[in-house]
């Protein structure tokens, strides 16, 4: 074992410090690094961020048209728009399609005592983000009433809001049941703050993206204002002043279609060209939506252009596997695409998803190379981490000394180190759809977090860094190129990469189990060893592992198990075993629709303890996502509990059983 550890540590030191990447020849590294342009990507961000890119909208269509034009100009194959019905009736697995929502006009004015407009509060034409998504048409004048958060009955005590507009600190959707449905308010003005980070509410001029429930029978409108505007209103209301507002919204909801731009670089190997590596992003989000997620969309467009240009000029050979690029709406568009195109899904070997990859220093962004779910281990994440470590080392050296083989900088960009973090699976974007056990596609997720301007009026192009865009695109492009070309001849180098990172993960596991009771520590250890063996087995998704490599793999994990120790066997008591309903694909919570709530009931869902559980390394939504992933027709409920405890921290068997019983009740599992 000492010899194994020594060889792995030596290999790791080489890959981090040398000016090359395993599995990517030096000429390929140079070609991609020199061609890929963060400045080009930033120009694309500027173009996309002009549009208010709501799903199934005129703004989204305009952004899609730009992508199609650029793909055609870059010379990609199979360039087209995939159109899938979005009418509020059609289902794509667990996603109820959401219809088109378009706005022709929306303004909010303060009205003087003489009935004339005295001050414009919001204008859709000037800033579309000021109108909450899915707002209904209205043309009315009403007094403004401060209703606090707007989500508690106590917020309305002693206040008459019937026929009036409420000023609230919560998202409009959360306010509707009480303010509009119960107490009769006719509209909402919200100053919901930016998402909670260390910089929460620090900038009082931010305007947050607002939402209303697409499918609610209670139709209303919501305007979004800054904290400064809200405080100014509140100061006047506290003195007893009456504030009259005129709200006018001209919007429509209609049957439409999810538009998904796609194009390919066709594989050249007759034996492998049917297989696909997919690059994805999500094209929707409000104007400006620069980092979220015009940045990811621009980055994969730049990767497509880079590959195509390098192949055309002979600096790269065509890939062995086909490389596909897709630009759907977040979550719902991706799920619709995967459900509607099983002919494509069956050929996808891996996906690389980019969501927020350009945040400069002002955004406070930290770049993450994020793994897929622990329930579905894959070596592709080790490949991405290896490339991320290479870029970290190169950019740190450049920042500290002014010299590096591959600084990966842009003239107009920053010179700071990338500082990428390598982290386990987190939820929050389309990667969780690819990886969901309905599809089981291994995924690499590249993303920024935190971002102080996410979902606000300040998510603008000026806060992005062209150097950051170049580096994040390079990590993705290098990962994708390796995956598009690896064969059994690369098994040795891949195994060395997996081996080194397996040891690092084992060290992390040993630290984490120290504070656990013996039973949970043993559970953590058993799952870890299963995870590492399964990760090595994932090589076979791409090729048959050669005998000279496979004979090393299992002895290594036997020795690793002996080194780790503390894995006492657990007798598996008789327990329920569930399997997925193959006719229903997707997770329970998607975009604008919750399958569990819709079918199990709101009150009954709220009583599910697993959804509220807070573990050492995850919370309710993560536990629920992985619980469904772990259902495979073989694991017992107790074994699923053990796996969840190992991934996120101890949880009771009763809580897991209750959740699985709820899924069985609505025929998600059987």
Where are these regions (language model features)?
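Second-shell loop/turn segments in exported
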Residues: 28-35, 49-58, 95-96, 131, ...
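Catalytic-core environment of secreted peptidases
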Residues: 21-25, 37-60, 70-78, 95, ...
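Metal-dependent peptidase/peptidase-like ectodomains
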Residues: 122, 220-225, 230-231, 328-453, ...
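Charged, amphipathic alpha-helical linkers/stalks
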Residues: 465-538
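Noncatalytic luminal/extracellular "stalk/propeptide" segments of secretory-pathway proteins
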Residues: 19-24, 34, 38, 46-162
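Extracellular/luminal Protease-associated
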Residues: 46, 56-58, 119-221, 288, ...
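Long, charge-rich, low-complexity alpha-helical segments
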Residues: 619-670
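Soluble metallo-hydrolase cores and metallopeptidase-like ectodomains found primarily
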Residues: 124-155, 209-292, 302-305, 309-318
């Amino acid at each position: 074992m000492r010899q194994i550890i020594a060889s792995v540590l030596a290999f790791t030191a080489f890959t981090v410090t040398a000016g090359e990447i395993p599995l990517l020849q030096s000429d390929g590294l140079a070609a991609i690094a020199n061609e890929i342009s963060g400045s080009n990507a930033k120009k694309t961000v500027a173009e996309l961020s002009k549009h208010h890119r709501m799903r199934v909208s005129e703004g989204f269509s305009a952004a899609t048209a730009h992508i199609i034009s650029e793909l055609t100009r870059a010379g990609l194959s199979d360039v087209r728009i995939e159109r899938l019905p979005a009418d509020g009736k059609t289902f794509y697995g667990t996603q109820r399609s959401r219809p088109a929502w378009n706005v022709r006009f929306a303004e909010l004015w303060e009205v003087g005592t003489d009935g004339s407009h005295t001050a414009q509060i919001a204008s859709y034409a000037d800033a579309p983000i000021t109108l909450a998504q899915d707002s209904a048409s209205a043309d009315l004048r009403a007094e403004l009433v401060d209703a606090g958060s707007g989500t508690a009955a106590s917020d309305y005590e002693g206040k008459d809001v019937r026929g009036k507009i409420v000023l609230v600190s919560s998202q409009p959707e959360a306010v509707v049941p009480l303010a509009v449905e119960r107490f009769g308010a006719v509209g909402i003005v919200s100053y919901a703050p930016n998402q909670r980070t260390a910089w929460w509410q620090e900038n009082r001029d931010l305007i947050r993206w607002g939402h209303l429930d697409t499918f609610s029978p209670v139709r209303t409108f919501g305007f979004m204002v800054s904290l400064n505007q809200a405080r100014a209103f509140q100061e006047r209301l506290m003195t007893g002043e009456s504030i009259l507002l005129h709200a006018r919204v001209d919007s429509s909801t209609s049957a439409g279609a999810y538009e998904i731009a796609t194009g390919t670089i066709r594989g050249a190997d007759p034996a492998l060209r049917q297989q696909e590596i997919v690059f994805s992003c999500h094209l929707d989000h409000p104007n400006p939506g620069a980092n979220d997620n015009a940045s990811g969309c621009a980055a994969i467009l730049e990767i497509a252009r880079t590959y195509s240009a390098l192949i055309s000029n002979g600096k790269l050979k065509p890939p062995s596997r086909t490389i596909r690029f897709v630009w759907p709406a977040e979550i719902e568009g991706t799920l619709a695409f995967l459900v509607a195109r099983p002919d494509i899904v069956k050929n996808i070997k891996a996906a690389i998803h980019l969501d927020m990859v350009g945040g400069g220093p002002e955004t406070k962004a930290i770049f993450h190379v994020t793994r897929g779910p622990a329930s579905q281990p894959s070596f592709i994440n080790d490949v991405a981490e290896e490339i991320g470590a290479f870029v970290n080392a190169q950019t740190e050296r450049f920042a500290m000394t002014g010299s590096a083989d591959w600084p990966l900088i842009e003239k107009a960009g920053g010179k700071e180190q990338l500082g990428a973090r390598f982290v386990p699976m987190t939820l929050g974007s389309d990667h969780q759809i690819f990886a969901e056990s309905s599809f089981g596609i291994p995924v690499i997720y590249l993303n920024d977090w935190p971002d102080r301007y996410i979902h606000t009026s300040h998510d603008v192009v000026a806060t992005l860094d062209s150097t950051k865009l170049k580096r994040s695109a390079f990590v993705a492009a290098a990962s994708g190129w390796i995956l598009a070309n690896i064969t059994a001849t690369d098994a040795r180098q891949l195994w060395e990469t997996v081996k080194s990172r397996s040891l690092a993960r084992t060290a992390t596991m040993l630290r984490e189990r120290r504070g656990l009771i013996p039973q949970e520590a043993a559970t953590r250890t058993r799952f870890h060893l299963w995870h590492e063996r399964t990760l090595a087995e994932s090589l076979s998704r791409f090729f048959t592992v050669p005998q000279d490599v496979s004979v090393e793999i299992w002895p290594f994990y036997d020795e690793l198990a002996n080194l780790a120790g503390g894995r006492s066997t657990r007798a598996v008591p008789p327990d329920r075993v569930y399997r997925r309903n193959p006719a229903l694909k997707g997770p329970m919570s998607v975009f604008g629709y919750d399958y569990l709530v819709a079918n199990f009931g709101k009150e009954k869902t709220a009583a599910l303890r697993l959804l509220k559980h807070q573990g050492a390394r995850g919370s309710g939504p993560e536990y629920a996502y992985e619980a469904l992933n772990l259902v495979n027709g073989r694991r017992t409920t107790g074994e699923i509990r053990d796996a969840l405890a190992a991934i996120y921290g101890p949880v009771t068997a009763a809580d897991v059983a209750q959740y699985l019983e709820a899924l069985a009740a609505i025929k998600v599992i059987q």
